[in-house]
């Protein structure tokens, strides 16, 4: 069977920890979209592992698959694999031959485009890792796929077609001299060919490439369990998110089918677990109706740190929750939980269960609020509007909950749900009721043993 893990908010919900939590019953963990822009942290046997491309389950000795919906930077991939091996692990990672490859010029173009957007306050908040430009080339039918790295003739043909186009973009559209860039070799066919053909040789030598759909289907047919791991979150989905402040792929459950080669029926017959942070965070620009305080350069109209409402509360949550980007180190914007957002995410992906993380971060507050509904042009909305411009005009209608005290969270995790403070349980049960979806797990700390497990999906 399959279990699909979907971020229900704006990313950084703690998906990797839930993948790890249920990992003992899994044979294969497959990522179905994104690239090395999606950082996740896994704590295993007291050791912390920060990954951006290797699937979380590989830390526990499971087979990790990067599906065809992913974009793969072989530099990052092999750096992570080599680092894990140096720490005594031996990750088994397979790469879909249909997955597209992030090439050096993608990263350069990503940086140029974001810098130009920043001059007009239209920046999306990209990590600069070439994800968007790679997906653009995929849609434009000029990309290079992992399977191409295995065939030198095909690889050279692809590069000789696309690289001159990219040089022309830099020189004729952006009016820059390629030779004066920090990495002029990023636009050199021979340099790219030599480096990426070597990556192809390593893929072959280590038998890493697969036909992902066929591989995963055979795994399921053998009675094994497959976990499908999404990156980022629903609200930055290219179709269902707050466009244009989105990623370039589909983190929602629908992307699990297209990004692995499994049928929608197979994915739909399994469990779909939405991962919910007990409050809200965001990296980058765009609306955030329940925001507390702000971050200069990200929060619209926010020009001086410390000027926003509830700044002290925002800093408290940010520090208690360690709310800084895994990949970029950028401070995350923080806000109260947003129920219209979660209702939207639940509908889009059809969650059969949710996992609520970071409940402990809110402990010690006198009052905890939730954005229960929005008001837009005098009308109350229970779910997000379709356009970002409408969302930016929404005002949150809050519901208040009495806070809960700090407790020994490790003991609470061991004893189970009934050991939670009563007010914390009221908060959890409100979320379950509003989404009509049970909480399968409740995270009360960063470690695997600091999660209350109420339901095993496998």
From Swiss-Prot:
Top enzyme class: ligase
GO biological process: 'de novo' AMP biosynthetic process; IMP metabolic process
Binding of substrate, residues: 326-332
Highest taxon in the source lineage: Archaea
Protein role: Plays an important role in the de novo pathway of purine nucleotide biosynthesis. Catalyzes the first committed step in the biosynthesis of AMP from IMP.
Family affiliation: Belongs to the adenylosuccinate synthetase family.
Cofactor-binding details, from the entry: Binds 1 Mg(2+) ion per subunit.
Protein's recorded name: Adenylosuccinate synthetase
UniProt xrefs under InterPro entries: Adenylosuccin_syn_GTP-bd, Adenylosuccin_syn_Lys_AS, Adenylosuccinate_synth_dom1, Adenylosuccinate_synth_dom2, Adenylosuccinate_synth_dom3, Adenylosuccinate_synthetase, P-loop_NTPase
Reactions that this protein is recorded to catalyse: IMP + L-aspartate + GTP = N(6)-(1,2-dicarboxyethyl)-AMP + GDP + phosphate + 2 H(+)
Sites where the protein binds IMP: 12-15, 37-40, 127, 141, 232, 247, 330
GO cellular component terms, A-Z: cytoplasm
Keywords: Cytoplasm, GTP-binding, Ligase, Magnesium, Metal-binding, Nucleotide-binding, Purine biosynthesis
Active site: 12, 40
GO molecular function, one term: magnesium ion binding
Subunit structure: Homodimer.
Functional pathway: Purine metabolism; AMP biosynthesis via de novo pathway; AMP from IMP: step 1/2
PANTHER family to which the protein is assigned, alphabetical: ADENYLOSUCCINATE SYNTHETASE (PTHR11846:SF0)
Gene transcribed to yield this protein: purA
């Amino acid at each position: 069977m399959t279990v699909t893990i979907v971020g229900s908010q704006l990313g950084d919900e703690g998906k990797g920890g839930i993948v790890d939590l249920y990992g003992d019953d899994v044979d294969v963990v497959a990522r179905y979209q994104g690239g090395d822009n999606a950082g996740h942290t896994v704590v295993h046997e007291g050791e912390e592992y920060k990954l951006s491309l290797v699937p979380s389950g590989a830390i526990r000795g499971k087979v990790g698959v990067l599906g065809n919906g992913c974009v793969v930077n072989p530099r990052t991939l092999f750096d992570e694999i080599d680092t894990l091996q140096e720490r005594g692990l031996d990750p088994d990672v397979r790469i879909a031959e249909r997955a597209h490859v992030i090439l050096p010029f993608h990263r350069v173009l990503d940086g140029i485009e974001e810098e130009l957007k920043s001059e007009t306050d239209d920046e999306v908040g990209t990590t600069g890792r070439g994800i968007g430009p790679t997906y653009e080339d995929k849609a434009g039918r000029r990309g290079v796929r992992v399977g191409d790295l295995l065939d030198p003739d095909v690889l050279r043909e692809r590069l000789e077609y696309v690289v001159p186009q990219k040089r022309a973009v830099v020189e004729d559209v952006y009016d820059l001299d390629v030779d004066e860039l920090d990495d002029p070799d990023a636009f050199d066919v021979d340099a790219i060919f030599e480096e990426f053909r070597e990556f192809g040789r390593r893929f072959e030598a280590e038998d890493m490439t697969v036909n992902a759909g066929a591989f995963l289907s055979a795994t399921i047919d053998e009675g094994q369990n497959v976990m499908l791991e999404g990156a980022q979150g629903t609200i930055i989905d290219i179709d269902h998110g707050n466009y244009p402040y989105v990623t370039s792929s589909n983190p929602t459950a629908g992307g699990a089918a297209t990004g692995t080669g499994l049928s929608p029926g197979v994915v739909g017959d399994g469990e779909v677990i939405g991962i919910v942070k007990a409050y809200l965070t965001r990296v980058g620009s765009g609306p955030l109706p329940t925001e507390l305080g702000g971050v200069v350069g990200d929060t619209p109209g926010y020009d001086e740190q410390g000027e926003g409402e509830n700044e002290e509360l925002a800093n408290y949550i940010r520090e208690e929750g360690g709310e800084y980007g895994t990949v970029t180190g950028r401070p995350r914007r923080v806000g109260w939980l947003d129920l219209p957002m979660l209702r939207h995410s639940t509908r889009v992906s059809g969650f059969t269960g949710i996992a609520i993380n970071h409940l402990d971060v809110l402990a010690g507050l006198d009052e905890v609020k939730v954005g229960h509904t929005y008001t837009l042009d005098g009308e109350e909305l229970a779910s997000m509007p379709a356009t970002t411009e409408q969302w930016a005009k929404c005002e949150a209608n809050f519901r208040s909950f009495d806070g809960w005290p700090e407790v020994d969270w490790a003991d609470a995790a061991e004893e189970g749900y009934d050991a939670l403070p009563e007010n914390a349980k009221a908060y959890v049960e409100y979320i379950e009721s509003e989404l009509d979806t049970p909480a399968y797990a409740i995270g009360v700390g960063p470690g695997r043993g600091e999660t209350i497990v109420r339901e095993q999906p496998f």
